[in-house]
Regions:
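Non-catalytic macromolecular-recognition regions in eukaryotic signaling proteins
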Residues: 1-162
């Protein structure tokens, strides 16, 4: 987990004073390691909790690829939306071998509660996942040996398990 931005006031039209934007990465052993999915179920849950709420902006989405850097000069707070991903913080670049991230929900939806600012919980019998297909460039660790899994903005304390 890495503190990406610490906010001390208004960003755009939103007061983010006291909020911190974190980015969570999978740390890999090798540059060519591949992260295909983050999944959870009732035996091995995946969760990212906050003691308050996660900042969600209407111009964002549940996936990092929903972020559009072209709007950030006009709506700067949208850059700090909370989302999940496999290696993307904006739309996939197909010419570079990147592929969009897909989501599956189980019996208990996790996307809608998370998009409403709640904690992310994947812990039911069917499980849930966000994933990319094998070979997508955005799942490859690269020189820094890490793959971005999500961005989370909160003014609370976070804990989690992936």
């Amino acid at each position: 987990i890495e503190a990406y931005a610490e906010h001390d006031g208004v960003v755009g039209t939103t007061d983010l004073a006291g909020y911190t934007t974190y980015r969570i990465y999978a740390l890999c052993d090798n540059e060519d390691d591949f992260v295909s999915a983050v999944a959870g179920d009732d035996e091995f849950s995946t969760f990212i909790h906050t003691t308050t709420t996660f900042f969600q902006h209407e111009a964002g989405g549940v996936l990092g690829e929903s972020s559009n850097p072209l709007i950030f000069p006009f709506i700067p707070e949208a850059a700090y939306d909370s989302w999940v991903t496999i290696g993307l913080d904006e739309a996939a670049d197909g010419t570079s071998g990147e592929s969009g991230v897909s989501i599956l929900e189980g019996l208990e939806p996790w996307v809608e509660p998370f998009e409403a600012g709640g904690s992310l919980n994947i812990a039911d019998a069917l499980g849930g996942v966000w994933y990319v297909l094998n070979g997508a460039a955005n799942g490859v660790a690269g020189e820094d040996k890490r793959v971005l899994l999500g961005q989370f903005t909160t003014d609370g304390n976070m804990d989690g398990q992936l």
